[in-house]
Amino acid sequence: MTIISFREWMKQYDLGTTVKETPIPIETIEAIESAKLVVTSDQRRAVQSAAELLDSLSFVQNPLFREAEVPTSFYAPKWLKCKPNVWMFIGRTRWIVGYSKEVESYKEVRERARQAANILHRYALVHGHIALVGHSYFNAMIGTELRAMGWYGSPIFHRKPWGCITYTFHEAMDGNVLNTKLI
């Protein structure tokens, strides 16, 4: 697809609905079932995923957890055709090095990830086990911030739908173990 087709594809992707093409892994189901609080962004796909996982709408939606957008307003020759994942890579790479036309800058998204990690930390202090149903790239950024705050969890994120990573925080003062699941 050309860059123009990719721009349209991204718009349609954002407006689309989730399709359960792959079964939900048991670890993800267990993470949701053990959570005392489930949080998601307000983006359509995340809300649909949370509703599918919970079979209800009993979760907190917060725009702070929205995915980091990929810039698509960059020049590419009209004859150049790439697969969507290649255009995503090009857009994401340009974004990381400073190109952010029409989207939040990398620096702004990193700050938002820091804020999101702080909110998740506070939710975990209150509720113990929590789950975030979110978006792969932004979840990875939140994971980086959680690890910087002393949480333990894998720096490797699942690229497949319905993947789950568990972060654990051992509170030294009273021996509490808090868990956050990023899905």
Show which residues each predicted segment covers.
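Glycine-rich phosphate-binding loop signature in dinucleotide/nucleotide-binding domains
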Residues: 31-33, 120-128
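Domain-level recognition of soluble alpha/beta enzyme cores
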Residues: 4-7, 147-175
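Active-site-proximal alpha-helix that buttresses catalytic centers in soluble enzyme cores
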Residues: 1-64, 82-94, 101-114, 168-170
